[in-house]
A protein has these predicted regions:
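Detector for outer-membrane/organellar transmembrane beta-barrel domains
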Residues: 1-105
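Extracellular loop and loop/strand-boundary signature of outer-membrane beta-barrel proteins
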Residues: 68-72, 104-107, 143-153
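Outer-membrane beta-barrel proteins, especially TonB-dependent receptors
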Residues: 8-17, 25-27, 31, 140-141, ...
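Outer-membrane beta-barrel "beta-signal"
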Residues: 120, 124, 129, 153-169
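Residue-level signal for short segments within beta-strands and strand-turn junctions
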Residues: 61-63, 122, 137, 167
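Transmembrane beta-barrel architecture of outer-membrane proteins
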Residues: 39-41, 78-80, 113-117, 158-162
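Outer membrane beta-barrel transmembrane domains
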Residues: 82, 86-140
Length: 169
């Protein structure tokens, strides 16, 4: 509604923007060789840039239906999403927060992944280079018992830190 939304989550050269975006998406993926799954995905999205502030959120639903060849009669439904924000605390330094959630076991089973994260982005001047650092905590919640929660691990790290150098062109 306020013009074209730039495809960025913040840019130190565009700190006077006032943009907003709403989106709806849907897709149906049909397995052509009848080997795996037929999937339906639906989502909604929001993003906003207002001066030094960036906000974004997305929610999605997915239905996974197995083909006859897979010999699995069940279909599974999943919900997930995220909320994130960034704010330029200095001319080239952006602080960021993010919260993801996902019920990777399907809506029929208890258990959610909750993934809060904190990060910083530093934008180098005049070279389209960005240094990103993020810490993320992965929690498993909503299980019936502590044993169910412990068994729903799959080797996921509880704590992770990522540092990335990104060049755009």
């Amino acid at each position: 509604p306020k013009g074209v939304m730039p495809s960025t989550q913040g840019n130190p050269n565009r700190l006077n923007e006032d943009k907003i975006m709403f989106g709806v998406s849907a897709s149906i993926n049909v397995e052509s060789e009848n080997e795996s799954t037929n999937d339906t995905r639906v989502g909604v999205e929001f993003a906003m840039l207002k001066n030094k502030l960036y906000l974004g959120a997305e929610a999605y639903y997915m239905n996974v239906g197995f083909t006859d060849r897979q010999k699995i009669n069940e279909s599974y439904n999943y919900l997930g999403g995220y909320v994130q924000g960034g704010y330029f605390v200095a001319p080239r330094l952006q602080a960021a927060l993010r919260y993801d959630f996902f019920n990777r076991n399907g809506t029929g089973d208890d258990g959610f992944l909750n993934m809060p994260a904190v990060g910083m982005n530093y934008f180098f001047k005049g070279c389209n280079l960005k240094l990103q650092a993020m810490y993320q905590y992965i929690a498993r919640t909503g299980h019936d018992t502590q044993l169910d929660r412990d068994n729903d691990n799959l080797g996921l790290a509880t704590h992770s830190a990522t540092v990335m150098l990104q060049y755009t062109f």
